[in-house]
Amino acid sequence: MTIEDYRIEFGWSKSKLCKEADIEMNTLQRAIDGSPIFRATAGKIVGAINQELARRGRPSIRYTDLEGVVFAD
């Protein structure tokens, strides 16, 4: 699944995901658009996703599981 798939499934706005992941909106947009992001940033996004997955009783994911994410490092 992509970042957007998770965001939409959770009913989160982009602002909500940014807040949960402690990242800036432009960083999130770059990740969604397929521009390179650092693995640490992907880790923050996945951390936010995993918290919600855990709340829903679902298994966690790794940043390498996110479709469409390009790493800068």
Predicted feature descriptions by range:
Residues 13, 30-31:
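Residue-level detector of alpha-helix boundaries and kinks
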Residues 22, 33:
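Positions that flank functional sites
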